[in-house]
Amino acid sequence: MGTFLARLIEEWGLGAPHIVGPDVGTAAALFLAANAPDRVTSLTIGGGAVRAPIDAGGALKDVIEAPSLDVVRQLDARTNIGFAVEPVAGADSEPDVHEDYVSAYDLGRFAESARFVRHYPDQNPVLRGLLPSITTPAQIISGREDDLVPWSNNEYLADLLPNSEIHPLDAGHFAWEQASDEYGRLIVDWVTGGFQRS
């Protein structure tokens, strides 16, 4: 995915943008910074299961550890995704938003998207070797109460990335929604000069 991002940045003539890549975007952004550092000015990452060994919970752990993609295909995608998004888009409180999240994984898209996280057991050890060499300034923002991607993933990044700072938020997995004001404020501060602190 990092290679794809580098090509996209080149094709769209974006220069060296500030990358905001929470959740699964964390690994992609880090691979981009490791392999094409000239393509990125800074990173805002966090909430991705990037540790080696993997530290994940709930349905994410089940998907990563499933013996095959066929097993993932048998999982009830609507239930799994519905449970994950309930704290930020409740089926009763925001039915349209909830349905949008859940239906995005219908028609086999849940299993197909699971291919990405199922590569973590192979990719995370490679990423671990690259992290100390990534000099791109990195801001790590995530919810401290994330049941899918425990806080230890963010501490791991802060320990291994030489130019990083970490910001725990009072939120779960969807920190950008659950603590949107603070999340947005941190990003604005970062891209308007804060990244130069690291």
Task: Identify what each model region corresponds to.
Residues 40, 161-164:
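Core-facing hydrophobic residues within beta-strands of well-ordered domains
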Residues 21, 25, 29:
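Gly/Ala-rich beta-loop-alpha elbow adjacent to hydrolase catalytic centers
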Residues 95, 109-159, 168-170:
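Conserved serine/cysteine hydrolase catalytic core
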Residues 1-17:
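Conserved acidic catalytic loop of the alpha/beta-hydrolase fold
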Residues 1, 19-21, 46:
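Short beta-strand immediately N-terminal to the catalytic nucleophile in serine-hydrolase-like folds
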Residues 163-198:
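Catalytic active-site module of serine/aspartate enzymes centered on a nucleophile-bearing elbow/loop
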Residues 79-93, 100-104, 115-122:
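Helix-loop "lid/cap" segments that line or gate small-molecule binding pockets
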Residues 30, 34, 40-72:
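Flexible "cap/lid" loop of the alpha/beta hydrolase fold
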